[in-house]
Amino acid sequence: MLVWTNSKQGTFTSEEKETIVIANNGETTVTTSDTPFITKVIKLYEESLDIQVLYYGISSTTGEKYPTEVRVVIPKGRYVSLRSLKSKSTENNS
């Protein structure tokens, strides 16, 4: 899961308990290779954060990892699970 816990910095915690921090300039300052990470901060609002997240899925046929990028808005203090990100990436983009 990703959770946005700080509206000023944009601190994320993944389901593996790794931390991803978005600095005030919108750049990713801390990432890990085995967890989702932020590729773009689209807009930082007072109560939500609009971002693009990159994570790796595993192909059911080949077993290989593949990158998936999806745009998601995270309300302040709320969790977003990878399962919900995956389902959103298959929906039509509006």
PLM feature segments, named:
Residues 9-79:
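Compact, well-ordered interaction domains used in eukaryotic information-processing assemblies
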Residues 81-94:
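Basic DNA-binding region of bZIP-type proteins
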